[in-house]
Each structure stands twice: as C-alpha cells, then as structure tokens.
C-alpha cells in the first residue's frame, strides 16, 4: 500500500509533465512559417468525410499551400489513405483542394496507403527518396506536432516542424481531450515505436 501511495502521485506527475511538454510543442518555433524552408512540406493526414477534408485537415492543407506559394517549399507531399466509406483517400482529397487552389500538379506528391502518423512519415520518407527530396517541413496541428517530430527524428528524417497557425481545437474541452489523446499516443510511441 505504501508503494502504491508513492507510485500513483509519481505517475500523475509524470503524465502531467508529458502533457505539458506536448502542449508547449517542439522547440523549433511551431506555427511560425517565416523561417521554415525545405524541399517539401509533408502534410500529415486527417479525417475526410466522403470527398471533403475535415476542418482540421483543411487547416493543414491551407498551411502547406501558403508555404508553397511563398516559395518556402517546392513540393507538397500529402499523406493518408482511404477510410472505409470515404470516396477519396486523405491524400487524394488534399490534392484536389490544392489543385483547386492553384498549386501546380507537378509540385504535388501523394502517398495513399497510410492510416497512422508513423505510417504517414514512413511512406512520406519513401516518396521523398524516390523524388530526390532531402529535407522536409512537417505540417500538423500544434498539439500533434511534438509526437510527429519525435517520430520523424526516430526515422532519421531531416525535418522541421511547422504547426498550423490556427487550430480547430479551440475550446478548453476540445483542447483537453486532444491533449489527453496525444499524451496517450506519445507513451504508445515510446513503448511500441508506433
């Protein structure tokens, strides 16, 4: 019983510290597009409804389009496969949005198989290698960025973060739920490597 009394507060403190660390985000200026530049922007996939990117995914896509329009990246690599019931895969829906926004087709790359963040990055790394691209800007939500960068680092990717400057997770409850989810998945990554 004494051990449990000591372990429980320590675990609560640990989880709280990890949650804070995730919430603060990576050290490399998340959300600041002013100083990022790379061969390619990797847009991590998110939900699609039918053929329409979710609001969260639209934020990521729009951020990548802005970086490409500013000349900070030459290519955009959209990641994400097709979920059951969707008309388009995540990367396909993102590509359609980018083309509609005027991004040249030759500047767009896709990978269509992944369903997790780690798969997004592993498959993106293969696409980059095939296209002769060496370094990347990884685009995701601010609270997702820490885990994404930990994964990219574990793969040996030359990458820097650029979190979306806005997020759809605005209310305290939405942020708390997403942060709890990210804290869980960060531990899952540390324990299982995915």
Regions found by a protein language model. Name each.
Residues 21-180:
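A structural signal for short, hydrophobic/glycine-enriched beta-strand patches
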Residues 1-32:
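N-terminal type II signal-anchor transmembrane helix
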Residues 172-194:
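A transmembrane-helix-recognition feature enriched in membrane-embedded lipid enzymes
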């Amino acid at each position: 019983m004494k051990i449990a009394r000591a372990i429980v507060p320590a675990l609560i403190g640990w989880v709280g510290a990890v949650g804070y660390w995730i919430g603060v985000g990576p050290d490399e200026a998340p959300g600041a597009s002013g100083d990022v530049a790379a061969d390619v922007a990797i847009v991590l996939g998110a939900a699609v409804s039918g053929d329409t990117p979710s609001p969260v995914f639209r934020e990521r896509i729009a951020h990548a389009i802005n970086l490409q329009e500013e000349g900070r990246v030459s290519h955009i690599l959209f990641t994400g496969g097709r979920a059951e019931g969707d008309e388009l895969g995540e990367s396909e829906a993102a590509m359609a949005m980018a083309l509609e926004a005027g991004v040249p087709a030759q500047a767009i790359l896709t990978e269509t198989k992944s369903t997790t963040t780690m798969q997004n990055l592993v498959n993106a790394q293969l696409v980059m290698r095939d296209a002769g691209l060496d370094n990347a800007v990884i685009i995701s939500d601010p609270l997702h960025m820490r885990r994404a960068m930990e994964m990219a680092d574990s793969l040996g990717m030359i990458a820097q973060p650029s979190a979306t400057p806005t997020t759809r997770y605005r209310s305290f409850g939405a942020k708390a739920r997403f942060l709890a989810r990210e804290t869980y998945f960060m531990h899952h990554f540390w324990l299982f490597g995915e």
